[in-house]
A protein has these predicted regions:
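A short tyrosine-centered beta-strand micro-motif
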Residues: 303, 319-326
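Aromatic/hydrophobic beta-strand junction motif of beta-rich domains
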Residues: 80-84, 243-250, 256, 307
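C-terminal segment of classical bacterial N-terminal signal peptides
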Residues: 13-23
Length: 344
């Protein structure tokens, strides 16, 4: 007999209305076009109790052909949907999960091997409503990283979340539930289609937030708000006998170079080394690096860095020099500043 969920109970549980998936999202899993039927695998005798339901096959549009490839792309699952209810007049607590699953023998549909990949949100599925005409689709927010090929899974006890007909072997039951860090485990207990669906959004910067609905700046992994396009400010540069002092407006990685002034000639907009061919070109000053560059992890505010021994003033030949500072913040914004000094 078809059972359903109370819409009012769903709203009270904090579930979202079911919107259309955004254009940038990829939806995979069940088409959710059936009510749960002949389900309740976790409560089957002789050992009723918690279990993990791992989907292996889902029918796909347009013709309902069986698909066993799991997630078609990598990214972040930002929402998932379940068509289910709690049996026995009680609400069901379920946990959204991802697993890797395969059939060791492709010709044997009776057994599969699975490994838990990650746990997602734990949510409450209201009890069945015998007066309702169909089971509504429940949608929940999430933020779960997914890799291409991962399969949808659900942990529960008194939950009806599959549709079983015609002997379909689309989902495998693991009892007790799969455990994080545990190796592959086999199962010969199977069921029909798992009524779970998920939306995957791209995650271009790899920060674990969906680029469409959760991340305002998909190009910078250090922020999920507005993009940081402000370069760090560099000021107060002072080159001492043994150390360098400077100030930063924000924390930044700093690269430092000592460069010496050399005479040059301007050729096609650049200051080149003087040669016989360009000796009549306009004069200019070119800066030539001395020794190796060195670096510092600069903090916001005042900073001090020891200068390598070979680059200290006492060990430099007389002439005009500059300290070139390049500061790059966590978002990749860069500022270059220099401070001239003379060695006599």
């Amino acid at each position: 007999m078809t059972r359903a969920l109370a819409g009012l109970a769903a709203a009270a549980a904090g579930m979202l209305a079911l919107p259309a998936a955004g254009q940038a999202a990829t939806t995979f899993g069940s088409r959710l076009n059936h009510d749960p039927a002949n389900s309740g695998e976790c409560m089957r005798p002789p050992n009723p109790g918690p279990c993990t339901l791992v989907s292996f096959i889902h029918p796909i549009d347009p013709n309902g052909d069986p698909y066993s490839g799991g997630a078609p792309v990598s990214g972040v699952i930002t929402k998932f949907r379940i068509r289910a209810f709690g049996e026995g007049g009680a609400a069901a607590t379920v946990t959204f999960r991802l697993a890797d699953i395969s059939r060791p023998d492709p010709n044997n549909q009776n057994s599969a091997v699975a490994t838990l990949v990650v746990d997602g949100p734990t949510v409450t599925i209201p009890a069945s409503d015998p007066m309702a005409t169909e089971t509504p689709i429940l949608e929940f927010p999430a933020r779960v990283k997914v890799s291409q090929g991962n399969h949808l899974a659900l942990d529960g006890t008194n939950v009806w979340a599959t549709v079983n007909n015609s002997g379909d072997k689309f989902t495998y039951v693991f009892q007790p539930p799969l455990v994080a860090g545990q190796g592959p485990r086999g199962s010969t207990d199977n069921a029909g289609e798992l009524l779970v669906q998920a939306d995957i959004e791209p995650d271009a910067d790899g920060d674990g937030f969906g680029d469409e609905s959760q991340d305002q700046c998909p190009s910078q992994g250090t922020t999920q708000g507005a993009c940081d396009n402000t370069a760090p400010g560099v000021s107060g540069i002072a080159v001492g006998a043994r150390s360098l002092r400077y100030r930063l407006s924000e924390a930044a990685s700093v690269t430092l170079k000592v460069q010496k002034a050399r005479p040059g000639r301007r050729v096609r907009g650049k200051c080149r080394r003087q040669t016989k061919a360009n000796r009549n070109r306009p004069r200019c000053t070119r800066w030539v690096s001395v020794g190796k560059s060195f670096s510092d992890d600069g903090d916001a505010g005042a900073n001090s860095k020891n200068i390598p021994r070979l680059l200290r003033k006492a060990n430099l030949a007389p002439g005009l020099y500059r300290m070139l500072i390049t500061a790059r913040d966590a978002a990749g914004n860069e500022t270059k500043r220099s401070k001239r000094f003379r060695v006599r």
